[in-house]
Structures are given as C-alpha cells and as structure tokens.
Amino acid sequence: FDEDRFPVLTGRCTECGFCVRCCPGGDVDFPVLSQQLFAATYDPADLQGYTENLFISHPVDQAVRFAGASGGLVTGLLLYLLAKGEIEGAIVVRMDPEKPYQSQAVLATTVAEIRDAAQSKYCLTPSMEVLQELRTRKGKFAVVALPC
C-alpha cells in the first residue's frame, strides 16, 4: 500500500480479472440477491431489508455502553468473551495513534486494547496484514468488521 493506503501493483499482476470479478465496485442487485438468498421479494421501501428477528441490546457496564458508537454492544461482547477465556483476542479497528486521521486493524489481546477500539470506523482499513498474524497464533480469535 502507498502512503494513502491504496494498493500498489507489485509486478505480480497476471491481468486475470479475478479481483474485479470478486469486487467489481458496482451496485448490488438487491432484488436478485433477496430472491437467491431468502426466496423473498425485495421491497425498496423496507429500510430493514429481509429480517427474521430484530433485537436491541447493550452492555451492563455503563462506561462501555456510552463509549460505544451505538451502545457498545460489540465492545461489551468482546470484553465478556475475553474475560471468560472464550477468545484470546480480537481483530478490531482503532484510529492510528501516529496518524489520528487514519484507522488501522490491530490484534487486541487486552481489555485496554479492546476498549481503545470502541466505536465504529467508516474508513478504508486494510486488514490482511493483521489477519496473517493469526497464522502464527494458537487459540480462538474474534474478528470485528463491516462489509464493503
């Protein structure tokens, strides 16, 4: 990646077009997607999309709840899983301490690191490097991510 976090061609591109087939950067055809995945008709007026159930929740810890963007549920869940020994850590996104205008994916293994990553980040955040780190680690890890 360059300094602006855009991919740099390294001379290994074979021009096969696989990357464009995986993520063409175009629109999602929601009517077709709804029919294929849910056998349901897509209604653009329904802002929720296809749902079976909706739940509302937040952590009991008020500090975690109000430090989050929308109630702190993900942060609270990660802290619970870490405390219970269900995970050894989580790949989360935080703001880069050296470049506070950029986000970065990190492997958080402590309460402080998980709390530091609270709130949603709507930024392009490369995560393959930190995902590769999991290859050398043993244990269970959570991944917090938003789809593209």
Where are these regions (language model features)?
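Iron-sulfur-associated redox domains of electron-transfer enzymes in respiratory
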Residues: 30-147
